């Protein structure tokens, strides 16, 4: 009897966490030819959000932010997502370590 109840509880927990994640605002970032499009992303401060990152370039790229402690390497043609916890108002830098001269951007939380 305990095992079926535990399985049910785990199933409900997973279903509710998926529903919560689907309600999260999603912002899109395109990486191509060593650049970010857009270079600046405006997000609401104090709100958890998802950043969907897509590499449309011919080589590997990297989304990295030391301030936000996030790093993501993408092969050509790959799309991946990062979830950010609520941010304080401010401006947070990100960059592409493989293209340091051109791959610069910023997330503005307002």
Residue positions per predicted region:
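Extracellular/periplasmic metallocenter environments
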Residues: 22-28, 74-110
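N-terminal post-signal-peptidase region of extra-cytosolic proteins
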Residues: 32-39, 65-68, 77-81
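Histidine- and aromatic-enriched segments that form or immediately flank copper-ligand environments
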Residues: 56-76, 104-106
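Sec/Tat signal peptide C-region and signal peptidase I cleavage site
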Residues: 17-21
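Beta-strand cores of secreted/periplasmic/IMS beta-sandwich domains, seen most often
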Residues: 39-59, 79-87, 93, 109
